[in-house]
Amino acid sequence: MDPSKLAKLQAGARIGGKGTPRRKVKKPSKSAMSAADDKKVQGALKKLNMQNLAGIQEVNMFKEDGGVINFRAPTVHSSLPNETTAIYGKAEEKTLSEILPGILNNLGPESLTALRQMAEQLKVSEGEKGADAQADDGEIPDLVEKFDEQD
């Protein structure tokens, strides 16, 4: 065999220094880390004596700024004596307009009125922001002197 080819192969196979091969560190995968987190959550839920609520397909949480936190197929646990509910899973932030068509047929009459009030508040707050931006433009004075020049 050609000595130059042999030297190239040996140089490529050498991992560590001074003749001892070093082992590569195996990093834990993200799924293993999430499994450990799930075990911690399950332990905390057992301490509170929480029961799993099956059959919940979607959870929407409405924020004050008009956004919505949406959970598709979440895991929901609840404990009535402790007055505690735990919702966990993959969350997505959405706007009210994105989520509205899908939830209209699930809402009752009280929820519809509350939703209308939230939509009106959102429109009013957006209108105020636009008015503030226009008012701020009018308050900026014109530059009449050159302050960086010395007389």
UniProtKB/Swiss-Prot annotation:
Residues 35-100 form the NAC-A/B domain. Coiled coil: none annotated. The keyword Nucleus applies. Its main location: cytoplasm. The keyword Nucleotide-binding does not apply. GO terms for biological process: 'de novo' cotranslational protein folding; cotranslational protein targeting to membrane. Pfam families: NAC. Keywords: Cytoplasm, Nucleus. Residues 20-29 have a biased composition (Basic residues). It comes from the Eukaryota. CDD domains: NAC_BTF3. It is found in: Cytoplasm; Nucleus. Residues 1-38, 123-151 are annotated as: Disordered. One of its GO terms (cellular component) is nucleus. Part of the nascent polypeptide-associated complex (NAC), consisting of ucp15 and btf3. NAC associates with ribosomes via btf3. Belongs to the NAC-beta family. Component of the nascent polypeptide-associated complex (NAC), a dynamic component of the ribosomal exit tunnel, protecting the emerging polypeptides from interaction with other cytoplasmic proteins to ensure appropriate nascent protein targeting. The NAC complex also promotes mitochondrial protein import by enhancing productive ribosome interactions with the outer mitochondrial membrane and blocks the inappropriate interaction of ribosomes translating non-secretory nascent polypeptides with translocation sites in the membrane of the endoplasmic reticulum. This is Nascent polypeptide-associated complex subunit beta. It comes from Schizosaccharomyces pombe (strain 972 / ATCC 24843) (Fission yeast).
